[in-house]
């Protein structure tokens, strides 16, 4: 029996040849099985093996798509592990540290990119590029308080706060979402994206903006340049900021480089910290994330992995039976990715997670306090640095209070298993058994530097309106 098994355990010459281009030295057996599974598929297609070898041996040269059939859920299983095929083979042959499909974008020459939802999917690793973090332009803070107090957004923000419902509204992903750039995974074919309910609109968001709104942003265009060219600085006839559709009103007066102090964004050592709560009690120490890929799960991890925050390790003498039962259902929890200046949350738990992110709500045109339900196996973009940068650059021209208000965008709340809001009997996140609060250090530190540069508020921050 052993001799029979050994006859079939050898590595074929084609697999050995392809493994010669493998990157990294980890998970040899897994990579071998992944390549072996691919070879079996490609041998059925004339010229596919040759095209793949050509792409791997000559990275700088043009190559054709190398495709395999798309599975029902879009994923491929290799040795008890499921993953997206283009991610698997980009990891084998280009980037061994690749974590997620959010880190990849197809090149224009690719005819069968993963995101196109065709019957075939291209796995040519040189038909994809890795997403790079965008360079955020510095915010130009006036050296003197030259903005008109009448232009302050404080009144608008106070009115918005007063109009916030006692209970947050709710939205379910993807049913309540209409932005196609945040697709659920896996996505069923021809999935409809109904418009979000008008009653849950975030005032002046990309999805709902009034004329002349300082927060009027195009939803899917890159941020405008904030630094005027040197030859235009100080001229009286300075032009509005260049945008793709001229939707953003001119909010920067004519200024010279001597009148403003640029405040640049700096990437911190830890991109976020995560604090765990049970009801209204904080449990354990804060977790500081240095890895761009973080798992928050309900298990224990004796190895003390720096990319895992294991809630199963944390004890609480005040824990009741509801909390105990909820903790048992957290399971694999949530996977947080920080990629290309964007934060994604992927629900790995069998139960849904519930997210309150003002940045995400702003993008989708929801009310600021809306709680979004993310079902199992779905992922959602919950923060976008570039949109935040636009808001910050514009808020500077409307006073200290408008900038200070953006601190609320830098904190994201997320509950496991149990939701809260208008559609649930729990009205507040502190009524849910198990939840976390995520603090985004980069945006918070940027805000702090801008506020320091701006000096004192025109109207002192107060709990009394």
Swiss-Prot record:
Q: CDD domains, from UniProt? A: MH1_SMAD_1_5_9, MH2_SMAD_1_5_9
InterPro entries in alphabetical order: Dwarfin (IPR013790), MAD_homology1_Dwarfin-type (IPR003619), MAD_homology_MH1 (IPR013019), SMAD-like_dom_sf (IPR017855), SMAD_dom_Dwarfin-type (IPR001132), SMAD_FHA_dom_sf (IPR008984), SMAD_MH1_sf (IPR036578)
Per UniProt, the ranges with Low complexity bias are 198-214
Keyword annotations for this protein?
A: Acetylation, Cytoplasm, DNA-binding, Metal-binding, Mitochondrion, Nucleus, Phosphoprotein, Transcription, Transcription regulation, Zinc
Q: Which residues carry this modification: Phosphoserine?
A: 463, 465
Output the GO biological process annotations, alphabetical, semicolon-separated.
anatomical structure morphogenesis; BMP signaling pathway; bone development; cardiac muscle contraction; cartilage development; cell differentiation; embryonic pattern specification; erythrocyte differentiation
Domain MH2, which positions?
271-465
Record-linked Pfam families: MH1 (PF03165), MH2 (PF03166)
Q: Give yes or no: UniProt keyword Mitochondrion.
A: yes
- Where does this one sit in the cell? Cytoplasm; Nucleus; Mitochondrion
Residues bearing PTM N-acetylthreonine: 2
Q: What is its main location?
A: cytoplasm
Mention any one GO cellular component term assigned to this protein in its UniProt record.
mitochondrion
Q: Where is Zn(2+) annotated to bind?
A: 65, 110, 122, 127
* Stretches with biased composition (Polar residues): 169-182, 234-243
- What does the entry's PTM section describe? Phosphorylated on serine by BMP (bone morphogenetic proteins) type 1 receptor kinase.
Q: Which PROSITE patterns match?
A: MH1, MH2
Q: Which GO molecular function annotation, any one, does this entry have?
A: DNA-binding transcription factor activity, RNA polymerase II-specific
What family is reported? Belongs to the dwarfin/SMAD family.
Assembly behavior: Homodimer. Forms trimers with the co-SMAD SMAD4. Interacts with PEBP2-alpha subunit and SMURF1. Interacts with SUV39H1 and SUV39H2. Interacts (via MH2 domain) with LEMD3. Interacts with WWP1. Interacts with TMEM119. Interacts with ZNF8. Interacts with RANBP3L. Interacts with HK1. Interacts with HGS; this interaction attenuates BMP signaling.
What is the official name of this protein in its record? Answer: Mothers against decapentaplegic homolog 5
Its source organism is Rattus norvegicus
């Amino acid at each position: 029996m052993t001799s029979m098994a050994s006859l079939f355990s050898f590595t074929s010459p084609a697999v050995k040849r392809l493994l010669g281009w493998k990157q990294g030295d980890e998970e040899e057996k897994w990579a071998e099985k992944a390549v072996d599974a691919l070879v079996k598929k490609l041998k059925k297609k004339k010229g596919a093996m040759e095209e793949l070898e050509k792409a791997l041996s000559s990275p700088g040269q043009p190559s054709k798509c190398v495709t395999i059939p798309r599975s029902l859920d879009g994923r491929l299983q290799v040795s008890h592990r499921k993953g997206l095929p283009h991610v698997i083979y980009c990891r084998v042959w280009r980037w061994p540290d690749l974590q997620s499909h959010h880190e990849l974008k197809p090149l224009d020459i690719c005819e069968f990119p993963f995101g196109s939802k065709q019957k075939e999917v291209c796995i040519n690793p040189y038909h994809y590029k890795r997403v790079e973090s965008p360079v955020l332009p510095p915010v130009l803070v006036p050296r003197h308080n030259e903005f008109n107090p009448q232009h302050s957004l404080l009144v608008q923000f106070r009115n918005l706060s007063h109009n916030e419902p006692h209970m947050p509204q709710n939205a379910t992903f993807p049913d309540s979402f209409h932005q196609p750039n945040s697709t659920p995974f896996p996505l069923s074919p021809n999935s409809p994206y109904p418009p979000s309910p008008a009653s849950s609109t975030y005032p002046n968001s990309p999805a709902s903006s009034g004329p002349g709104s300082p927060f009027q942003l195009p939803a899917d265009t890159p941020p405008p340049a904030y630094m005027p060219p040197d030859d235009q600085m100080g001229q009286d006839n300075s032009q509005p900021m260049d945008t793709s559709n001229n939707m953003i009103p001119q909010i920067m007066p004519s200024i010279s480089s001597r009148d403003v102090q640029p405040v640049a964004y700096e990437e911190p050592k830890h991109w976020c910290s995560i604090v765990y709560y049970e009801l209204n009690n904080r449990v354990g120490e804060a977790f500081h994330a240095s890895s761009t890929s973080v798992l928050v799960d309900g298990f224990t991890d004796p190895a003390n992995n720096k990319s895992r925050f294991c809630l199963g390790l944390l004890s609480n003498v005040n824990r009741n039976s509801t909390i105990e039962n909820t903790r048992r259902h957290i399971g694999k929890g949530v996977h947080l990715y920080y990629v290309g200046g964007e934060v994604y949350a992927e629900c790995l738990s069998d139960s849904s997670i519930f997210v309150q992110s003002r940045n995400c709500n702003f993008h989708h045109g929801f009310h600021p306090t809306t709680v979004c339900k993310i079902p199992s196996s779905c992922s959602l973009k919950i923060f976008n640095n570039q949109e935040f940068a636009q808001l910050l650059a514009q808020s500077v021209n409307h006073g200290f209070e408008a900038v200070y208000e953006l601190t609320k965008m830098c904190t994201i709340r997320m509950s496991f298993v149990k939701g809260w809001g208008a559609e649930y009997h729990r009205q507040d996140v502190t009524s849910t058994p198990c939840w976390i609060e995520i603090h985004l250090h980069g945006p918070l530190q940027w805000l702090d530097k801008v506020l320091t540069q701006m000096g004192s508020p025109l109207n002192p921050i107060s709990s009394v309106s």
